[in-house]
Amino acid sequence: MPNNHPWAARKNIDPKELSDEKVLLLNSGHCFSLQVVESCPDLSKKGEVLQGNSLETIRNMVASNLGITVLPKSATSDRYQNHLIKVIPFIKPIPSRTIAIAYRKSFVRMNAIEIIAEAVRLIKTDTIEML
């Protein structure tokens, strides 16, 4: 949210509170937007929802005071910091998502799949929890 938003001093937010806010999401049909709407079902019923093409575009829209957004935790790390916005986590239970590597049984380059899976396992960050 923008630094000047009334909630900017809060430690956390209940997803239900987003229903009365102008919320910026990725374009409809994007899997992350669908997950946000599933986590905040009242969002599209009451509040105004605007769309952007990328998380970076949405982050800049928030910095310009056009609304607030929900970001995946991986998009809130230090390398994405912007002094014009404030990141505030949801209350527990914090919504999460599961991502998997899927491939056909007949896929002939299993070595490529194993290398990708190993690369994901080697990622050292608190934004990913391996199952």
Regions found by a protein language model. Name each.
Residues 40-49, 84:
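A local structural motif
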Residues 1-23:
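Flexible hinge/capping segments at coil-to-helix
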Residues 10-11, 17, 57-106:
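Beta-alpha-beta core module
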Residues 5, 30-31, 56, 74-75:
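Alpha-helix/helix-capping structural signal
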Residues 16-20, 41, 62-63, 80, ...:
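Alpha-helix boundary recognition
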Residues 25-26, 45-54:
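Short beta-strand-to-loop elements that line the ligand-binding cleft
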Residues 7-8, 21-43, 109-113, 117, ...:
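Secondary-structure junction motif
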Residues 2, 26-27, 71-72:
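Thr-Gly-centered strand-to-loop micro-motif
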